[in-house]
Amino acid sequence: MESALPVVVIGAGPQGLAAAAHLVERDVPVVVLEAGTGPASAVAEWGHVRLFSEWPELIDAAGARILEPTGWAAPTTGYPTGAQWISGYLAPLATELGERVRYDARVVGVSRLGRDRLVDAGRGDQPFTVHVQQSDGEEYRLQARAVIDASGTWSS
């Protein structure tokens, strides 16, 4: 049963989207949970800042392979701003990942199914339970075989 569960990636920024792209290439089900309203919400907060890395260093190989069949062409030179990084790569990748990426989905907790501080036996054999809250206060839970925390340096 656990192999049918998705891997949950917390954060739809550069690292979260790259992790999702690698999982998609390996046919591993994945759900990306992003607290913000769009991809790379934290990057968008400093979108006017020019990055210290050139385009080739900012594009993950798996992400590029997913985008290339859509006609997307990787920028090859220059130092983009955060906004250019989003519009030129991160947003197209998130779009191509489609319904795997969920916005307005703040992760408020991660636990093991049926386990807590008092019930520890067999913890490693149980799937993860990811507790998610939306901005309207609605909450839901997802079960996952693994969780990748790519939530970044600060919350958006």
Predicted regions and their residues:
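Extreme N-terminal leader/targeting segments of oxidoreductases
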Residues: 1-7, 25, 121, 138, ...
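Glycine-rich active-site loop/strand segments that organize a redox cofactor
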Residues: 36-88
